[in-house]
Amino acid sequence: MGVGGTLEYISELIGNGGSHSYGKRKKKKQFQTVELKVRMDCDGCVLKIKNSLSSLKGVKTVEINKKQQKVTVSGYADASKVLKKAKATGKKAEIWPYVPYNLVAQPYIAQAYDKKAPPGYVRKVDPNVTTGTMAVYYDDPSYTSLFSDDNPNACSIM
């Protein structure tokens, strides 16, 4: 145990009030930005959301874009706790479901286009989902059998 280890040991003793926690170390939360989609109708709703999320421990900034119904929370708070706190205000809240249009490799999947998406955004879609893009193959009758006398579903113009 060098000088660095000794200083670390002493700071842990002082920081924990003298309790011995040799093997237990607290995980430091990482700084993160959480984006939410929250339904807000009026300025009162905006104020209610802002005050609620600002009171959360670890939150540094709360930015609200009322036009896009978007709330951006920056700080050391966990995303699930931020979402839970936003829902506790009585508003419909979810993690921001959109990504900028230019970041999507192929936004040609049918579910990516959402009429409610803000301009320049498309809905996040799992790239493995290919619903609607797969062609359905079935046995086409050959052209020679379409006009055959043996085929009851053949040309019936007469």
Swiss-Prot record:
GO terms for molecular function: metal ion binding. Keywords: Lipoprotein, Metal-binding, Methylation, Prenylation. Residues 156-158 form a propeptide. InterPro entries: HMA_dom, HMA_dom_sf. It holds the Pfam family HMA. The modification Cysteine methyl ester is found at residue 155. A lipid is attached at residue 155 (S-farnesyl cysteine). The keyword Electron transport does not apply. Residues 31-94 form the HMA domain. A metal cation binds at residues 42, 45. It comes from the Eukaryota. Belongs to the HIPP family. Interacts with ZHD11/HB29. Heavy-metal-binding protein. This is Heavy metal-associated isoprenylated plant protein 23. The lineage of its organism: Eukaryota, Viridiplantae, Streptophyta, Embryophyta, Tracheophyta. The gene is HIPP23.
